Regions:
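Conserved two-lobed SF2 helicase motor
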Residues: 103-119
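A short beta-strand element within the Helicase C-terminal
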Residues: 111, 120-133, 156-158
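Conserved SF2 helicase motif VI
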Residues: 133-157
């Protein structure tokens, strides 16, 4: 199952037809996302520091370099994850289990590259904010899909980086 597997499914269908009884489709539901905003990169730190104390945030950054910058600013108040396979930054940050344990964030802020999005979910009622610094539609879908609601009252706000705003 995948929220972003359309291209793969098309390729598979072109090479060999899948029997009807073996195709399963589940609806994508983003009802838990109550509000959506755009942010400029220069405002990110101010926005994060102004969040209510009891609320947590997942921040999907573009690179290991971004993780280093955020670590300079937020220090031990946040967790930082980059794939171990990243040759330049892989071993410089937290292990995934130090960031997310039993599907809950271990720190108020969790900065990560999109590597976190592969096969991982967050079921944490205190995660109320997702900041997505991605521009590819499939990456955005994967990032937004990491937060899984526990019930209808478990909602969040998603902030998409406005790349045009960074030019001003």
């Amino acid at each position: 199952m995948s929220a972003t597997g359309e291209e793969t499914y098309k390729l598979l269908e072109e090479t060999s037809k899948t029997p009807e009884g073996r195709i399963y489709k589940l609806p994508q539901d983003y009802q838990h996302i109550k509000q959506k905003y755009f942010y400029s990169r220069e405002n990110l730190v101010m926005m994060l520091k102004s969040l209510p104390e009891e609320e947590k945030a997942v921040i999907f950054v573009s690179s290991g370099e971004d993780l280093l910058k955020m670590k300079e600013i937020f220090g031990d108040t946040a967790a930082y994850y980059c794939s171990d396979n990243n040759p330049k930054y892989g071993k410089r940050f937290n292990e995934l289990t130090e960031c997310v344990k039993d599907r809950e964030l271990q720190k108020r802020y969790f900065f990560t590259t999109k590597a976190f999005g592969i096969g991982t979910e967050i079921k944490d009622r205190t995660v109320k904010h997702l900041y997505i610094d991605q521009w590819k539609p499939t990456d955005i879908i994967q990032s937004a899909g990491r937060k899984r609601p526990l019930d209808v009252d478990d909602t969040c706000t998603v902030y998409f980086r406005d790349y045009d705003a960074d030019w001003y």
